[in-house]
A protein has these predicted regions:
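Sec-dependent N-terminal signal peptides
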Residues: 4-13
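Histidine-acidic metal/acid-base catalytic patches
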Residues: 20-28, 40-50, 131-134, 138-140, ...
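Active-site mouth loops of central-metabolism enzymes
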Residues: 28-41, 88, 113-122, 218
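Conserved beta-strand positions in the central sheet of alpha/beta enzyme cores
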Residues: 31, 58, 84-87, 105-106, ...
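Active-site-proximal loop/turn and secondary-structure-junction residues that shape catalytic pockets
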Residues: 34-36, 63, 89-91, 110-114, ...
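Catalytic domains of carbohydrate-active enzymes, especially glycoside hydrolases
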Residues: 42-65, 84
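Active-site-adjacent beta->alpha loops and helix N-cap segments on the catalytic face
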Residues: 65-72, 154
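Active-site acidic/histidine proton-transfer and metal-coordination neighborhood
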Residues: 82-83, 87-176
Length: 269
């Protein structure tokens, strides 16, 4: 009887943890810098995110934002936000991470090299990542292989490259950042793809999902498939980070995030 009660309690706790990652203050805001129609600066952006109740940010950038890197870090600290992830990598940012003692995930697209066999492609893709694998290890940062289409965006290939780096380069800090807006080809087999990737997932970014990616970027709750896909995520026991997007150049980031927060809440009810 005691053993049965213990198993039930463990299951209940696991379910609670999986649900907690959908709480507003656990969600990661993504694609909120260059895509913001209002072109906010660091202080305005941090204040807006805090006002929305979001506390984690994955920072994407363009060349014009390099001079703002440190101010972005300082404003996040001031407003109680977690600098959760950083796009691609930049030595000035790495210097600042060391200075301010922060360790965000680094997200980088996995390339799609040509080779004569699947094994050779996996090895070649891993090879292209090695400088960043080493640099992130030195910084104490996790490295997320990011799906952005092509061979390198396929769940099975992301997993294979992760496994290769873990086995041959002792790179246990490498995982997967999977984006639904680059994953329309896996709507039909989402449960299988999620099961493959789950042990390696560092973040899972949500999006409204229609057949044929029409449109590619869509608010949560307005698509045909994201409710079913989110249900699968919750049932899988995945308890890691969940991201929501702006990614719409013509829209105020605050509005885009609000729409996704509202859509997500309707799905979760």
């Amino acid at each position: 009887m005691k053993k049965l009660l213990f198993i039930l309690l463990i299951g209940l706790c696991a379910g609670t943890n999986a649900a907690d990652n959908f709480a507003k203050d656990k969600l990661v805001a993504w694609c909120v810098v260059p895509f913001d129609a209002k072109q906010r600066g660091p202080a305005e952006r941090a204040a807006m995110l805090k006002q929305l109740g979001l506390k984690r940010v994955a920072y994407d950038w363009r060349t014009q934002h390099v001079k703002e890197f440190e101010e972005e870090i300082l404003q996040y600290k001031k407003h109680g936000l977690e600098f959760f992830a950083f796009w691609k990598g930049h030595e000035e940012a790495f210097r600042l991470f060391e200075k301010h003692k922060i360790h965000p995930q680094i997200w980088r697209t996995l390339r799609s090299p040509q080779a004569d066999s699947q094994e050779a492609r996996v090895a070649a893709a891993a090879q292209t990542m090695l400088p960043l694998v080493q640099r992130t290890k030195e910084l104490g940062c996790k490295l997320g292989l990011y799906n952005h289409g092509g061979w390198g965006g396929e769940p099975a290939n992301l997993v294979a490259v992760c496994q290769y780096l873990h086995k041959h380069h002792n790179a246990k800090h490498v995982g997967i950042v999977y984006n639904l807006h680059h994953g329309h080809g896996h709507i039909a087999d989402w449960e299988k793809s999620l099961r493959q990737m789950k042990p390696y997932l560092l973040c899972l970014n949500l999006n409204g999902m229609n057949d044929g990616a029409e449109p590619k970027i869509l608010q949560l709750g307005r698509g045909q498939h994201e409710a079913t896909m989110i249900t699968a995520i919750r049932k899988s026991g995945y308890a890691g980070p969940i991201g929501i997007l702006d990614h719409r150049n013509d829209t105020d980031t605050e509005i885009a995030l609000k729409e996704n927060l509202e859509g997500l809440q309707k799905i979760l009810k």
